[in-house]
Design a protein with these regions (language model features):
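Conserved acidic donor-binding segment of nucleotide-sugar-dependent glycosyltransferases
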Residues: 290, 294-301, 310-316
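Aromatic "clamp/platform" in nucleotide-sugar-dependent glycosyltransferases that forms part
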Residues: 258
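Membrane-proximal helix-turn-helix segments that form the acceptor-binding/catalytic region
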Residues: 110-129
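Glycosyltransferase donor-sugar binding loop
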Residues: 202-220, 236
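Conserved donor-binding/catalytic core segment of Leloir-type glycosyltransferases
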Residues: 166-184, 190-195, 204
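Short hydrophobic beta-strand element within catalytic cores of glycosyltransferases
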Residues: 275-278
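Short alpha-helical donor nucleotide-sugar binding micro-motif in glycosyltransferases
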Residues: 237-238, 245-250
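Carbohydrate-associated surface elements
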Residues: 135, 157
């Protein structure tokens, strides 16, 4: 018997950010390896702040779906409580939560409260909730009223790659991956690197610069003000299939995020044998082990600068962490898709 499900996503599934990569890879594995027939539903752009017309179209598209399991990405699900309430009796709704919407950095108190209330109302209507980390699952139970009995954790998968030893001298190549938005902490990273002008380093930032024009403009202006334009490159959005060479050429991955629901970029760096500097925010401590990286408090410029100085100056310490990274075995996408499929099967 052919197993069927719908997977509703906000906008273009090809967007190269972590949540969309997760959706895309799970859909691909369900379809190709596990023989599910997946109907991908585009809910439109602009989430979590869709225009009225987009919201109406999204609700209509969801209502028109057959009554098999319907997975709705949390970026949209959390702001469609009216659709969730209408469809809860007729459809097996599955909310896929990458991280609670209210925890995005840079929100006003009013916006955060509105998103929290909306997402809480929507999640009450889900037949089941899938969180992408145990950290997110705990938040959903504690703050959003999600009962543990209707909650599963399915972390992202990670592609397994060959990661050769590193002990390179000369200019240290730093890599940061993630959209240029307040939550990623690029302002903290640039401030820390500004203190290390005497050391040999170059930074490449790979991430969409269009999601927050204000943040991107501010970051470029600060880089110029500090005289770092010849040492920091912003590549913009990079397709997933083009990321591996960036990881392979990097000596050190650094991303001082203020929150991560999982932290796929950290896992990708570790899978490529790249030592990591991250923060203690959200799920990052569960993704980055002490053998593979070092963590500092979010927004702590002094601590970040100290760890950067220590690792930029010491190839041996970088290689020790790189060896730890090479020993880490994350689950594959096929393994995680099988877990995802078991959740859907349990709703039959």
């Amino acid at each position: 018997m052919v197993r069927k499900a719908a997977f509703a996503v906000p906008g273009d599934l090809a967007i190269p950010t972590g949540g969309y990569v997760y959706d895309r890879r799970i859909i691909a594995e369900l379809s190709a390896a596990l023989a599910w027939r997946i109907e991908v539903v585009d809910l439109g752009d602009g989430f979590p702040y869709p225009a009225a017309g987009t919201r109406a179209t999204a609700c209509a598209r969801l209502a028109a779906l057959p009554r098999h399991p319907v997975v709705i990405d949390g970026l949209a699900f959390g702001v469609l409580p009216e659709a969730a309430a209408t469809l809860r009796a007729s459809h097996r709704l599955v909310a896929l939560v990458h991280h609670p919407l209210a925890l995005e950095s840079g929100l006003s108190a009013a916006d955060a409260a509105s998103l929290r209330a909306s997402e809480r109302s929507a999640l009450v209507c889900a037949r089941h909730v899938i969180a992408t980390s145990a950290t997110v699952a705990r938040l959903l139970v504690a703050d959003y009223g999600v009962a543990s009995g209707r909650l599963s954790v399915v972390e992202p998968g990670t592609d397994r790659v060959s990661a050769p030893p590193r002990n390179r001298e000369g200019v240290v190549k730093l890599l940061a991956v993630g959209s240029v938005i307040p939550r990623k902490g690029y302002d903290v990273l640039v401030a820390a690197l500004a203190r290390l002008g005497h050391l040999p380093w170059r930074l490449v930032i790979a991430g969409d610069c269009g999601r927050s024009q204000q943040t991107s403009r501010g970051l470029r202006a600060e880089i110029a003000r500090l005289g770092l334009t010849d040492r920091i490159s912003l590549l913009g959005a990079v397709a997933s299939e083009q990321m591996s060479p960036l990881y392979t050429s990097a000596d050190l991955f650094v991303l001082p995020s203020r929150f991560e629901g999982y932290g796929m970029a950290y896992a990708e760096a570790i899978a490529h044998g790249v030592p990591v500097i991250g923060t203690t925010a959200g799920a990052i401590p569960q993704t980055v082990s002490a053998d593979a990286g070092v963590l500092v408090a979010p927004d702590d410029v002094e601590a970040l600068a100290a760890e950067l100085q220590r690792l930029i100056a010491s190839p041996d310490q970088r290689e020790r962490l790189a060896a730890g990274a090479r020993a880490v075995k994350f689950p594959s996408w096929s393994e995680q898709a099988a877990r995802f499929a078991r959740v859907l099967e349990s709703l039959a």
